[in-house]
Amino acid sequence: MTEEKLLTKYEISKKERTEFVNKILESSGTKKVVVAGPGTGKTYLFNQILQNKKNTLTLTFVNSLVEDLSLELFGLSEVRTLHSYARSMLSKLSKKKINVFHKFSKIVQEDAKLIIDKEIDFNKLFHEREDENEHLIFYKKRRDYYNYYGYASIIFAIVKYFEKYADRIPSYDQILIDEFQDFNKLEVSLIDLLAKKSPILLVGDDDQALYEFKSANTKFIREKYNGVEPKYDSFTLPFCSRSTRVIVEAANDIIKEAKTKKLLIGRIDKPYKYFEDEEKEKECFKYPLITYSHQYDKQIPWFIDKKIKELLSLEKRSFSVLIISPLKKQSYFISTNLMSKGYQNIDYIEKDKKEFNIIDGIKLLLEDKNDVLGWRIVSKFILPEKDLIALLKTTDSNPEKKIIEILSKNHINDVKKVLSLLNYLRKKKPVDKEDFDIIIKSLKIDSLNVLKEYLLNEINSSQFKIGDPAIRKIPIKSTTIQSSKGLAADFVFITHFDNSYFIRNKDKSIISDHDICNFLVSITRTKNKLFLISSSKDEPTFLKWIKKERYEIIER
């Protein structure tokens, strides 16, 4: 009898997975790219790669992923976002303080509209490396005036620096790059420069590409994987140990149907397999099917509450829950409704607002009362538009003149009054109602909304607890599809699973690769069981792509 026959299916699966990992670890190449599907052991690989290496660097581009990786790789590697790394390097090499404001490109975009009457997407110019574009001259002029960078322009700056001074590119024992499928041309330029001096390992999955809004392109990981120069050694991690069998099979159904419909053209062909594990098999037996249900919009929180309580009866232990909705307002509605039912451990993950507001400016001025960018932001909200245009044109023609030198004394004093009151609040000093009203009015805060939030928090934190005690501490995260990247939970609820949200084209028969990736990322957050909840009576297209034996339908 052969050794293979003596091994159990679990031992065989473990042996095969180890062989895939060892191929990567034992490769002598200094440039490697690993295509790893959801839950296939990327973090374990990172840990193994970093063993016995001292000077290492791990880069990704999402703050939430940095936090998770920093914890998982604690003591093994410095983990940074690309813009954070660019800022620290530029500061170190230039020996200057580098200021970065995440909405800076939006401000310069508005300046361009008001000063030269042109709509310019500066981030796109940086992301796509349009280095010679004439509009970058205007951007640089405004950057110099405000003494700030944005996230894209700080990466652009360090790339240009390294391209000019190649001898100053730092070297590391190992560089790891996470989520490479979501990198754009600018970010890839930085990675290629760093790869000239250090061993580098890129990890990503072109089936999980979500960030096309920042000009990310799957062609970069595909070119590296398929051997386009510079030559990278290519590997895969095929075994998913996160999800139950039905989730892995459903993901494969989606990919197979997409390919049948001539979608996902150019996709890296790689296996995605359920990892045979004795403990996971118990969860597969307990949760063999995906649950699909149609619920009217306002019934969705009720349905989620009902299912969580059913799961509690079955599990008799705490477990994690992830609620994924297409829109922030849907996520917020569900979160607040669940809180009113007694759930107290809800993490409502809200993406930062893209547009800047007066509070952004006030924050900068609280740190430095002479901050030029802070005064620029505040000016937008205290001046009539014609006065703002005149002010900005003055700063453009006469950049030596600071905004605080142009504003009227009354405007300056009003802002300083607010800053003074806020500093009082910071120091927990008393502020009377009249002064507090000044703050509310100046910062354009919706006092009714603030009061509603306060009362809701007070009710939920009251000693008179509402709802079933068993549900109060269940950890729940409620978020959007894009913000779910990097997350995983025992039980996942995907809400508003309708063509109107999951297929972006007005013609719902036209499905994009991006739509497919969104759905694949959403369902593969699941460890044990997935619930798909539609708010429309029409059967969702993606549900039709999953074999019927993999899901059950629960009527309202």
Stretches with model-predicted labels:
Residues 80-148, 152-153, 393-443:
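Coupling/switch/interface segments within P-loop NTPase motor domains and analogous charged loops
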Residues 1-95, 252, 323, 484, ...:
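P-loop NTPase Walker
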Residues 188-286, 543-554:
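Conserved RecA-like helicase ATPase core segment
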Residues 4-26, 30-38, 231-241, 260-324:
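Inter-lobe coupling/hinge region of RecA-like P-loop helicase motors
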Residues 1-40, 44-45, 97-176, 185-190, ...:
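Accessory N-terminal region flanking or inserted into the helicase ATPase core
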Residues 227-229, 315-437:
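ATPase/helicase motor core of nucleic-acid motors
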Residues 79-88, 176, 203, 453-504, ...:
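Conserved helicase core region in the C-terminal RecA-like lobe
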